Swiss-Prot record:
Gene3D superfamilies: Helix hairpin bin, Tubulin/FtsZ, C-terminal domain, Tubulin/FtsZ, GTPase domain. It comes from Guillardia theta. This is Tubulin alpha chain, nucleomorph. CDD domains: alpha_tubulin. Keywords: GTP-binding, Hydrolase, Magnesium, Metal-binding, Microtubule, Nucleotide-binding. The gene is tubA. GO terms for biological process: microtubule-based process. Its cofactor is Mg(2+). Belongs to the tubulin family. The keyword Protease does not apply. InterPro entries: Alpha_tubulin, Tub_FtsZ_C, Tubulin, Tubulin/FtsZ-like_C, Tubulin/FtsZ_2-layer-sand-dom, Tubulin/FtsZ_GTPase_sf, Tubulin_C, Tubulin_CS.
Amino acid sequence: MREVLSIHIGQAGIQVGNACWELYCLEHGINPDGSIIQDFNKKKNDDAFSTFFSETSTGKRVPRCVFLDLESGVIDEVKNGRYKNLYHPEQLICGNEDAANNYARGHYTIGKEIIEIALDRIRKLVENCSGLQGFLIFNSVGGGTGSGLGSLLLERLSLDYGKKSKLGFTVYPSPQVSTAVVEPYNSVLATHSLLEHTDVAVVLDNEAIYEICQRSLNIERPTYTNLNRLIAQVISSITASLRFDGALNVDITEFQTNLVPYPRIHFMLSSLAPVISLEMANHEQYSTAEITNAAFEPNSMMAKCDPRRGKYMACCLMFRGDVAPKDVNGSVAAIKTKKTIQFVDWCPTGFKCGINYQPPTVVPDGDLAKVDRAVCMISNSTAISEVFSRINKKFDLMYSKRAFVHWYVGEGMEEGEFNEAREDMAALEKDYEEVGSESQDLISNSFF
């Protein structure tokens, strides 16, 4: 079997993880305690669940995942939540002291104490796999644990499991909404690590998803639960082809092969369509062409950047439900004729499509309406560099005054690491600029 391990780090990683496992359980007919819903699997392929779940001798399903945090608050929520009996107690790992929004605490001082325990649990999970395909890593880069401990874990996974794919779902700071003053520092330091130690990183940002919830689902004040359930739908769509049958299934390494033209250019935009509320669903039915167009709308993007201001290098469309290959071909052909959707001239085709017959599942009493067909798009666009430029500007404003730097140095970090990480970000911005430039000749050897 081609198993995938999920690692959820820090508050954002764990809360997104909760929403994902809630959805996977519904999709695979698994109760909150890991038992199987009777008669559910008769109509589905029986071992679909084993990519993400292992099976105990008593027939209980256990998620192949680890939840990791430096303080116990969010892990306690999982331990006392609806799915408390789903996870093995050893999969929920927490320390006693939090990272206090400080990358250096997560990476050097507090993180060092917990990393060996985490790697030991991961090793046990890996030993329980017959053919590990790779890791999914969930974290945010604004806080201390997600950025610091997240980077440390990625570095160690590269050492221990060098050849395995690492796919990151990374929450970046929002342009307007900030949860910590030092977010720009943490983000730049963590991206420096993501560049080297992930193969594909899907960039998410709370503000963009917040606006989708307000606009498309008519939720006046979206909560993290609303946001995370929407993120879970994207992650479920990306991983559906690892778990269910379809006409064109997409493997984790295929994402890499099709989306990443140069190793460093691996930060992806994602979108989902249709996102419709329960009251709208009764009056509307969306065709394959309509949902494909909707996925390319700037408003549908799960990160704050405008793809019309950049060029696409590659694009993965994962369709679910009642979708025929000929409709997909027609929709993609129509997209290619649109002037607003520009591809770089050295990559004229740029589309990878997957079709999965499992229709989208929604959480009962949730905000999303059940639909017959949906599409999730993961695209590699030069527009994503807007996210980095924004963070770099904020970093420069603070770092020019050396504001807050003593908190990092006090935790054993060298000040030179700030400069090194910032230079790497400047190089990344330049890489994106070169890739989007008109001619292939301008692309230098700096990518290799």
